[in-house]
């Protein structure tokens, strides 16, 4: 696929828009206010390596255009001073920024090993 992944570059934008345009109407039908279980819309996940505000804003705009009206969120890994702090306001900012972290140095590739 042409274009840098997780960006607003045209090749990738065409691909993610096609996907969102099929998935978002399904999510919209299943929102909490319409009798479904969906209470949040996670626009991205651990997006601290790229900070393309146009990409994040486009994802949110497409969600709203599809009728998604629950709060929009995203989460950053390890509170790395990334999306939630860098983009707290302005284009691409989400309503509920979140942070995730892995307890006790847990690594998915070594699930039997835990740090102190």
Language-model region placement:
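Substrate-binding cleft/loops of secretory-pathway carbohydrate-active enzymes
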Residues: 46-69, 76-115
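Active-site mouth of glycoside hydrolases
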Residues: 1-59, 63-69
């Amino acid at each position: 696929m042409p274009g840098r992944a997780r960006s607003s570059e045209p090749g990738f934008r065409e691909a993610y828009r096609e996907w969102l345009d099929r998935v978002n109407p399904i999510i919209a039908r299943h929102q909490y206010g319409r009798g479904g279980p969906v209470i949040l819309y996670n626009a991205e996940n651990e997006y601290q390596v790229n900070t393309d505000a146009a990409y994040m804003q486009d994802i949110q705009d497409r969600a709203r255009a599809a009728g998604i009206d629950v709060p929009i969120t995203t989460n950053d890994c390890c509170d790395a001073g990334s999306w939630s702090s860098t983009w707290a306001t302005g284009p691409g900012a989400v309503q509920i920024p979140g942070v995730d972290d892995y307890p006790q140095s847990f690594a998915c590739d070594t699930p039997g090993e835990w740090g102190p």
